[in-house]
Structure formats: C-alpha cells, structure tokens
A protein has these predicted regions:
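Domain-level signal for soluble alpha/beta catalytic cores
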Residues: 1-149
Length: 149
C-alpha cells in the first residue's frame, strides 16, 4: 500500500530552514566541480509559486502568503549566488497549472495570479545580479495528456 500524502498547511510565519544543509550541498558541489574543467555551473532552486500549494491558515491573503514564501526563498537564492553559482529558478507552475486549477479560472484571472507570482519572485531576487540568474519554465511532468499546453 502506498503512503497517504498529507497536504501542507501553513499555520504560522514562514521562515527558511536548512541553511546548514544548503551550505553543505553547495560546498560538496563546488568540491566536485574542482575536479573537472567547467567555466560555470548553476544550481536549481524552486520558484516561490511552486511552494505552499497547500492551505494557508495564517496569512490574511494569498498575496501575503506568496510574498512570505518569496522572502524565505531569498535566503536560498542569495546563498547559491554568493557561493559563486548561477541560480536557476525552476518554475513548472507558470505553464502547467492552467488546466489543473479547479474551478478553472478565466484567462484574465490566471494572468493576474501569474503576475502576482512573478512579482513575488522579483522581490525574492531583489539585490541579486540579473546575470547570475536564469529562469527555467517547463510544462511539468505528469501521467496524463497535456491538453492545455
């Protein structure tokens, strides 16, 4: 029997956890790269819009919730760039969520939501040089037809 997935629920202020693990991973990656000939390397990190797709029971609005997530992720984004890597923002949600939302939003509602996600991401990237960031938009991967791509 497969384990039951538990929905995430935000019940308090969002903070970044895992700085030590992140630093260890960045140091290990840097060490591994020291043994090969590369000009530059990137480290992927998830977009704020992909985190916290569960229930928000703490923040007053969806926008407050998303911006709190973005602020927490700024810690990770900055650490990646400070370690000398290019930061790759992975954001499958921009493309894949359109046909998964229930109830299905209008195109105007979807664009408004995605604009808010972009604004939150821009807040998280504030102060990080543009030439140290790349954005990866994909259509996600799931076991079903991609009818809305």
């Amino acid at each position: 029997m497969l384990p039951v997935a538990l929905a995430t629920v935000c019940t308090g202020p969002i903070t970044y956890k895992g700085e030590d693990t992140l630093q260890r991973d960045l140091e290990n990656f840097k060490s591994a790269l020291g043994r090969v000939n590369v000009e530059e390397a990137f480290v992927p990190s998830i977009a704020p819009s992909m985190i916290g797709r569960g229930q928000n029971k703490y923040y007053g609005t969806e926008q407050e919730y998303r911006f709190a997530i973005a602020q927490a992720m700024k810690t990770e984004y900055k650490a990646i760039v400070d370690a000398g890597f290019i930061l790759q923002i992975d954001d499958p949600g921009m493309g894949e969520t359109w046909d998964m939302m229930v109830p299905h939003p209008t195109l105007e509602e979807y664009r408004k939501l995605q604009a808010m996600y972009v604004e939150a991401l821009n807040q998280a990237l504030k102060g990080i040089p543009e030439d140290r960031v790349r954005y990866h938009l994909c259509w996600g991967s799931w076991q079903g037809p991609h009818l809305g791509d």
